[in-house]
Amino acid sequence: MKERMENAYTETMFLLKKYNITANKSLGQNFLIDDDVINKTVASAEITNEDLVIEIGPGLGTLTSRLLEKAKKVIAIELDKKMIKILQERFSLYSNFELINE
């Protein structure tokens, strides 16, 4: 199952509009929209299919989708209830995805 679009900007704008979401500044939210930044982040982490990745504040899951392609398991910790719904809808079919929302 391929969940992401052709680029992070398009994906982010689509999800923000679809779910009527704006950044919650009190939670320090911002959204990754630059594919180069995402790709460099994932590459510099040197993630393999043996790795467990813990992602704090996955937001819309733009980085999460890249991590799921590389890691054995991704545990995402999210506090925002609106984001939890989106993450569940996007990644519930991934066997290597776990969402913690406490």
Please identify what each model-predicted range represents.
Residues 1-102:
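Catalytic cores of RNA-modifying enzymes
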